[in-house]
């Protein structure tokens, strides 16, 4: 799925735009026991409660593609004959109305998910979307529908204890201590089937993880029986390892600055282009950056081999997962220097009298803990 397709579905989660008739789910305690079930008609829920449910489900389609939103790909064999794909299809085709199928799905989540000591809420909803035709200007034609897209969306939300506080009780006209449990934003979730080329793709699902460094592979194994792509944090670490192992002493400050600047430029240009497809960087593209910076061909070949080991042959990477484009940060054991990414060139390395130094020009005003200071010798 691309950004436009995700955004198109996210707009469904409003009271006047969706066709969700019921909300299903269950509340699970820290002992992995189902405490209660949810089977609520959206038509009779108070509007504020219905909107709360929709907002939680909508968040399972939030975040960045390739970071929080991860493509899950089924093999042809799985789609043809596998328990995991059959269950997902049964959830969708039954419109979630079959309690036995829902229970089987709940148990897959409960038996695999590790949220520590947290209670959590599993939510499920079924929706059918009349996919409107787009004209030559990429605008929706409200009077023309190409097909219906039926899908299931799921999210898993931690349920947290709220601190006891004073609250006003209108019946008693008094203040009393009150506490309770509140449903937090989803930790994970998914959409099935995927909405590719504005149509159902039963070979794919879209998985959501709130944390980019912890994508709950245990749930992906249980529900989808497939291996997810590397998380954003894993991609960044693997890329850094490939550079440091292959380049050795050639992996200096100037080279890393150049790589950061080149990748940041690509990210900014992609944003400005409004291209809905995720930005991709091939290993050959990364090798070209090294070559432009004068890295020896032998080391570039070692880098390509290391990338093949880390990511697999022919892998493409998302530059946004490899760097933090919002800042340029340099750390030592005792200090951290952070500058705006457009000013990364200000940070230099020098060896003075045998010691390594980080240098930053101080041509303008200097503040220390909010105090304006001057440099000795000015």
Predicted regions and their residues:
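Long, hydrophobic alpha/beta structural blocks
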Residues: 11-17, 21-324
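C-terminal, beta-strand-rich globular interaction domains
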Residues: 277, 286-378
């Amino acid at each position: 799925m691309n950004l436009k397709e995700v955004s198109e579905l996210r707009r469904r989660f409003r009271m006047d735009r969706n066709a969700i008739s019921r909300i299903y789910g269950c509340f699970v305690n820290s002992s992995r026991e189902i405490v209660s079930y949810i089977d609520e008609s959206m038509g009779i829920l108070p509007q504020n409660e219905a909107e709360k449910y929709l907002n939680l489900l909508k968040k399972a389609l939030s975040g960045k593609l390739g970071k929080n939103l991860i493509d899950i790909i089924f093999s042809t064999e799985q789609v043809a004959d596998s328990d995991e794909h059959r269950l997902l299809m049964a959830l969708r085709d039954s419109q979630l109305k079959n309690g036995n199928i829902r229970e089987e799905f709940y148990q897959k989540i409960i038996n695999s998910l590790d949220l520590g000591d947290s209670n959590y809420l599993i939510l499920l909803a079924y929706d059918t979307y009349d996919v409107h035709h787009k004209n030559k200007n990429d605008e929706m034609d409200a009077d023309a529908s190409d097909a219906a897209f039926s899908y299931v969306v799921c999210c898993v939300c931690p349920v947290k204890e709220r601190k006891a506080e004073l609250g006003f009780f209108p019946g008693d006209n008094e203040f009393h201590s009150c506490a309770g449990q509140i449903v937090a934003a989803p930790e994970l979730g998914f959409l099935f089937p995927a909405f590719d080329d504005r149509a159902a793709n039963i070979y794919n699902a879209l998985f959501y993880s709130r944390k980019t460094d912890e994508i709950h592979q245990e749930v992906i194994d249980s529900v989808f029986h497939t291996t997810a792509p590397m998380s954003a944090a894993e991609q960044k670490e693997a890329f850094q390892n490939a550079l440091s192992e292959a380049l050795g002493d050639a992996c200096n400050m100037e080279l890393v600055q150049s790589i950061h600047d080149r990748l940041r430029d690509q990210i900014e240009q992609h944003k400005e282009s409004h291209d809905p497809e995720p930005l991709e960087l091939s290993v050959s593209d990364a090798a070209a950056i090294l070559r432009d910076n004068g890295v020896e061909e032998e080391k570039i070949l070692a880098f390509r081999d290391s990338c093949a080991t880390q990511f697999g042959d022919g892998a493409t990477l998302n530059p946004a997962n490899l760097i933090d484009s919002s800042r340029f940060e340099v750390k030592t054991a005792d200090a951290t220097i952070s500058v705006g990414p457009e000013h990364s060139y200000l940070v230099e390395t020098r060896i003075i009298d045998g010691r390594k130094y980080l240098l930053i020009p101080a041509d303008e005003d200097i503040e220390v803990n909010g105090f304006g200071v001057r440099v000795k010798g000015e």
